[in-house]
Amino acid sequence: MSIQDVKNYLPHRYPFLLIDRVLELEIGKSIVALKNVTFNEPQFTGHFPEQPIMPGVMIVEALAQATGILAFKSEAGKPIDGQIYMLVGIDKVRFKRMVEPGDQLRLEVEVITIKRGIWKFKCKATVDNQIITSAELMCTQRTAG
């Protein structure tokens, strides 16, 4: 899935669109996406100027955006249909390594459960096959606006 396709499934735009490409997607089960980290991103002007590292919350947000694409594709919807997926919970977050400009984040998400409209996902972000961040995320669908 190209960036143009990604933009059809996420309402986010620059500088907060954190998915560059989807490599794999299995409806209702899993997604693998990429985020290319570059020095030109605005967070690096303050985090930290002498040693730029991607904030952990931005890594979690990238994972959350991957969950949104998976949920939209699984439910055959899009944000233009008046619906959005909102992050409603984060559990078991661990940060193991730093992410620096030039890294490519591989975002891997699997559906754990779907109960009463709440999706629960097992997520991990890796760089060069090393785990950077792991977490369980929850999201639900809401009407936009």
Swiss-Prot record:
Coiled coil: none
Protein keywords: Cytoplasm, Lipid A biosynthesis, Lipid biosynthesis, Lipid metabolism, Lyase
Catalytic site positions: 47
ATP-binding as UniProt keyword: no
Catalytic activity: a (3R)-hydroxyacyl-[ACP] = a (2E)-enoyl-[ACP] + H2O
Localization terms from the record: Cytoplasm
GO molecular function: (3R)-hydroxyacyl-[acyl-carrier-protein] dehydratase activity
Gene Ontology process terms (BP): fatty acid biosynthetic process; lipid A biosynthetic process
Pfam entry (one): FabA
Listed GO CC annotations: cytoplasm; membrane
EC annotation from Swiss-Prot or TrEMBL: 4.2.1.59
EC supergroup of this enzyme: lyase
Family: Belongs to the thioester dehydratase family. FabZ subfamily.
PANTHER family recorded: 3-HYDROXYACYL-[ACYL-CARRIER-PROTEIN] DEHYDRATASE (PTHR30272:SF1)
Annotated function: Involved in unsaturated fatty acids biosynthesis. Catalyzes the dehydration of short chain beta-hydroxyacyl-ACPs and long chain saturated and unsaturated beta-hydroxyacyl-ACPs.
Name of the protein in its database record: 3-hydroxyacyl-[acyl-carrier-protein] dehydratase FabZ
